[in-house]
Regions:
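Single conserved hydrophobic/aromatic residue that forms the stacking wall/gate
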Residues: 1-15, 20
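Nucleotide phosphate-binding/pyrophosphate-handling subdomain across enzymes
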Residues: 16-73, 88
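Short beta-strands and strand-loop turn motifs
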Residues: 23, 121-125
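Residue-level signal for inorganic ion chemistry
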Residues: 31, 52, 76, 122, ...
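Short, active-site-adjacent cap segments at secondary-structure transitions
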Residues: 60, 84-86, 127-131
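C-terminal helical cap/extension that packs against the catalytic core
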Residues: 62-118, 154-156
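Glycine/aspartate-rich loop-and-adjacent alpha/beta segment that forms the canonical ThDP
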Residues: 125-151
Length: 156
């Protein structure tokens, strides 16, 4: 049995659900690989209070399945081609806003999570092809924007 090094393990974590930053008590999770409603439901089930960044190009799947996680959602930030449908999915159930870019989505979600004490989770339930070449590129954009957020005085 050969123990793996961090370098050997790390590539398998890219795009998976993981905490990429804790900023002033708000944790940011990248689950860009979740391209179906089922995957997003599974990811969010482990959280208590989530500001969910969700959307992209729907793969002709039933996005109403996402209502199952509504009790865990503080707010929804809908992005991409499916944003309009997602506002209908959560209408009257969870406050939902539409963001025109990932930057706008992350900045809004960060503010909402700071107020609520929740976590920000990118778990799109959709493909990335409306804005990106693939889910890795979408996840990388999310990470870059999260790390570009201004540090708060209490950040390490």
């Amino acid at each position: 049995f050969k123990q793996k090094t961090a370098y050997e393990i790390m590539p398998s974590l890219v795009g998976s659900e993981m905490c990429i930053r804790d900023r002033n008590g708000v944790r940011f999770f990248n689950d860009s690989k979740a391209t179906t409603p089922h995957a997003t439901v599974a990811a969010v089930t482990g959280f208590e209070q989530v500001v969910l960044i969700v959307g992209g190009r729907n793969k002709d799947l039933d996005l109403f399945e996402l209502r199952e996680i509504a009790p865990r959602l503080v707010e929804v930030v809908a992005i991409g081609e499916s944003a309009e449908v997602l506002t209908r999915v959560f209408e009257g159930v969870v406050p939902t806003v539409v963001a025109a870019s990932m930057k706008e989505a992350v900045e809004y979600a960060a503010r909402a999570a700071q107020k609520s004490g929740g976590d920000v989770v990118l778990s799109p339930a959709c493909a990335s092809f409306d804005w990106y070449r693939n889910y890795n590129e979408r996840g990388d954009d999310f990470k870059q924007i999260v790390f570009s957020l201004e540090r708060e005085p209490t950040d390490p």
